[in-house]
């Protein structure tokens, strides 16, 4: 969840949690196009999977590739010059890297049947990462970690001298940050108690070269898509209950280049297209209610058809009308069934963040699983892996795919839990006790230091029942416990988790569509205003069985190293016990006036009101 204290609160965010005014929403779309990384979702023809990650070398590589790439040539030339000159200083860096993020993007935003935003831009940003001291103890240790990178805008053209001068200036700034930070680290280490985890600050990895070549992007029909965005947003006008709507299309072509003093040279092109449709309404008690549908593909050609999108909007409007009339849920503790998407978000928040490597070393963290390697942490029928090398599952593109992480390490599948037993963590180049190497999960948004992060978190099960039988299994569990009803969580918008030991080790998952499923055979009842809450160690042991189909949740996850695209994949899951609480909500009244053009709006000169549009059920 978006939070200023990202070191304390970690979570998934999506467009569904963005600002609720047109101007703020449009600005959020524009700002969201800025960050991207080596880990950005790749489309067909972009950087290949890590199965063929490229060659390795013990000396500088990629010189030939730089001949026709002015930016890469400028990076390598300035890196060599800076490395040679800084070696002569009293505090010579032992590691230096440049990463340049190049991004061309186009954004269309529509609302109420008209375009709100239509813009394109080219952005280029450079990160200069530097480490002084030695791998055992350097300037990035502990709370001084931000001193390891300085970021700034880079000239957009191919003027090599201008590019090198900017890199030179950023390198100078970074060196002047890193040296005092190292002094502070050494002083602090001398007066503080000995740390429990004495692992080095930086791992030694084999230098890698991978020079990906971007395919020509598919032709994009700007006029046709402008018209389509207006048409789609105009569809919401058929529904008076929907008082806010946004439809946005973001098309991005990106190129990330990374070179290091160790000899790595990694260039990864990527392409992605993302369509987001959102509708919002408000219940009589002031609770804001929303429905969001998100689609992504390598290009606009891979998005759903016009007919499919119209059907989604109709379903969103029907859901919103039903939510307005639904009762508010009461606090509850009992059997619950999570759809596959809901279970995917649940695992991302409750488990995934606690398996990120740096959290096992940081003494401010709760370290829920740090000393549980080799122990059972889930039911034996469940296994969990994180595999950023996979581009899609069941025909659905995965947002968490990447070929190389932000430290230039090839992405890898990591089996973190096998048959319920904890086996590993998601590692960047920050070693922890018993895990000395990266496994390709060092990720960050530009301007921030990488940490171990999730990519494609995948939950598999050997205790499966057909998905159409899961509801009956829920009813059986409700009857077994003597409860009047259980809860079914059909759709979800995101969540967040608390991981620092100064805070409760708790999580909160934010459902959108929730039903009461009665044991006595009454029809399911839609409810609203409910959040899933709990603590990880208790919640994860209460999974009874799972469905037999995998479901995908694509989103954007925010943590210390910024916002990165992620996917979570899981089957539907039955829990013997799940706790929910009432959701805090606003108490603003309904709009005083009806929207113009709706059946209840004022009509001048005594004209008849237009017929009320029908909602397809």
Feature-to-residue mapping (PLM):
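Active-site bordering "gate/hinge" segments
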Residues: 38-404, 409-412, 418-421, 434, ...
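His/acidic/aromatic-lined binding-pocket segments of jelly-roll/cupin-type domains
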Residues: 414-415, 516
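Hydrophobic alpha-helical bundle architecture
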Residues: 400, 460-538, 554-561, 565
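Bacterial N-terminal signal peptides
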Residues: 21-37
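C-terminal, non-catalytic macromolecule-binding modules
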Residues: 422-477
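A glycine- and small/hydrophobic-rich beta-loop-beta segment
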Residues: 389-398, 403, 411, 429, ...
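N-terminal secretory signal peptides that target proteins for export/translocation
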Residues: 1-18
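Residue-level structural signal for beta-strand termini and adjacent loop
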Residues: 292-294, 428-430, 529-530
